[in-house]
Regions:
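N-terminal capping segment at the start of a domain
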Residues: 31-47, 186-188
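Cofactor-binding active-site loop characterized by glycine-rich and histidine/acidic residues
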Residues: 38-41, 53-175
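Glycine/aspartate-rich loop-and-adjacent alpha/beta segment that forms the canonical ThDP
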Residues: 4-10, 208, 224-312
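Short internal beta-strands
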Residues: 76-79, 180-187, 191, 344, ...
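Conserved thiamine diphosphate
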Residues: 147-148, 197-230, 412-431
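Non-catalytic terminal/interface segments that mediate subunit docking, oligomerization
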Residues: 294-389, 395-396
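Thiamine diphosphate
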Residues: 116-180, 349-427
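Short acidic, glycine/serine/threonine-rich loops at helix termini
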Residues: 88-91, 164-167, 193-197, 229, ...
Length: 431
């Protein structure tokens, strides 16, 4: 199969950046232009995260396009990492990454699926979630020792706030007067599978952050009129700041908007690629909005899309075998035979095949959110109480982050089963 794609060439970004217009209008135009190229990039790769890229691109472009002008040493990076296609396209738009990388997401000698320091103007690797604020603190303190004035802006996700390291890292931010720091929360209300509220509700985020003594503002993170004022207020405060950016997952393409889903419904554009029809509809909607905005402001600026056809991909076999489907049936069958089996999940119910288990045994399905250490320790107690807990996550998360908790469980000489998915060197579909 192959796809017929469209993208916006670099010359249009450079022309728009050079035009003297209201920065807010420029932000809207560049962000929608980036959304077109994000879709192109992800479809070329066959994998990527559209929803979180679309929710955060407006904020990224404001930081790199406007806030960057006021700081000689600005560090800006993403802690959540899923929005790498957005970050790459924002860097490309502002000349910080070569345009030739547009077709090279998840390719050898191209751009990695998550940010990596071997990519120009990427300051930190984004691995498991929760590390970004800690890394920001280290950057600030190191620059202070060197006598260099810096500004550090780190973008986190709302699902990411379920990781314990986030709350450890906030403890001394105010105490140490880290006024160089601004933390952005892309509060798009959805994570890998379902809404944050259902998975692991964060409740009153603003009050939580303020309890750490950190200046905190909430605003619409997809409305440049709101978040530009919020950034200005935080910068003038001369205190460490947190911007809770209330965004919409998939913002920019109406049928991708997460806020239209029913309670408990799965979001379809978190990871992976899209069909030709979905691509065409998305490009049409984005192109029209760009055209309408340029006409509204009487801009001498018209975009012509460039076309690109992906190489033909021949599948070696038409027979598909799904290990996930087999696993799903097997764990349900085992649970039917043994009422002591419980399944614990770390916000990966789709990718670990637990949907049928949850439907059939809702009381024996334990959703833990993005909190592997908590999940593993809960499993240890289930085992101590005579149950057979089966713990589910991606192997890369399950083998390292809760290693001490796994060790502790093993010293209790109980039976806990750890089921790790997507082991291996090559990236899986979810990215």
């Amino acid at each position: 199969f192959k796809m017929k794609l469209s993208y916006i060439n670099n010359e249009y970004f450079q022309k728009l950046i050079s035009i003297e217009i209201d920065p807010k209008v420029k932000n809207k135009l560049i962000s929608d232009m980036c959304r077109i190229n994000i879709l192109h990039m992800i479809c070329c790769a066959g994998s990527g995260h559209i929803g979180s890229s679309f929710s955060s691109i407006d904020l990224m472009n404001w930081v790199l396009g406007e806030i960057n002008k006021n700081h000689e040493n600005l560090y800006f990076f993403s802690s959540k990492g899923h929005d790498a296609p957005a970050l790459y396209n924002s860097l490309i738009a502002y000349g910080k990454l070569d345009f030739s990388f547009l077709n090279k997401l998840r390719k050898i000698d191209g751009l990695p699926g998550h940010p990596d320091v071997n990519t120009p103007n990427i300051f930190t690797n984004t691995g498991s979630l929760g590390m970004g604020i800690s890394k920001s603190k280290g950057i600030i303190k190191a620059n202070r020792l060197k006598g260099i004035k810096s500004k550090v802006i780190v973008l986190t996700g709302d699902g990411e706030l379920q990781e314990g390291q986030i709350w450890e890292s906030l403890n001394r931010v105010s105490q140490e007067n880290l006024n160089e720091l601004i933390i952005i929360v892309d509060n798009n209300k959805f994570q890998s599978d379902r809404s944050v509220k259902i998975t692991s509700d964060l409740n009153d985020l603003e009050s939580k952050f303020k309890s750490f003594g950190i200046e905190t503002i909430s605003c619409n993170g997809n409305d440049v009129n709101e978040f530009s004022k919020a950034f200005e207020t935080l910068e003038k405060s001369n205190k460490p700041g947190i911007l809770i950016a209330d965004t919409i997952k998939g913002f920019g393409v109406s049928f991708m908007h997460g806020d239209k889903l029913e309670e408990g419904e799965f979001y379809q554009f978190h990871s992976g690629s899209i069909s030709q029809d979905v691509f065409d509809s998305s490009i049409s909607e984005l192109s029209k909005r760009i055209s309408d905005l340029t006409e509204k402001h009487n801009l001498d600026f018209k975009i012509e899309l460039s076309n690109y056809e992906t190489p033909e991909i021949s599948l070696s076999s038409n027979k598909k075998q799904s290990l996930l489907a087999s696993y799903s049936k097997s764990i349900v069958s085992l649970a039917e035979q043994n009422e002591k089996i419980v399944a614990l999940d770390g916000d990966l119910i789709l990718d670990t095949g637990l949907i049928e288990f949850e439907k059939k045994f809702p009381n024996r399905f334990i959703e833990c959110g993005i909190a592997e250490q908590d999940m593993v320790s809960q499993a240890g107690s289930f085992a101590k109480e005579g149950f057979i807990p089966i713990v589910h996550s991606f192997s890369s998360f399950l083998t390292s982050r809760p290693n001490e908790q796994i060790y502790n469980n093993s010293t209790e000489e109980t039976k806990v089963i750890y089921s790790g998915f997507l082991s291996g060197l090559l990236p899986g579909g979810p990215g």
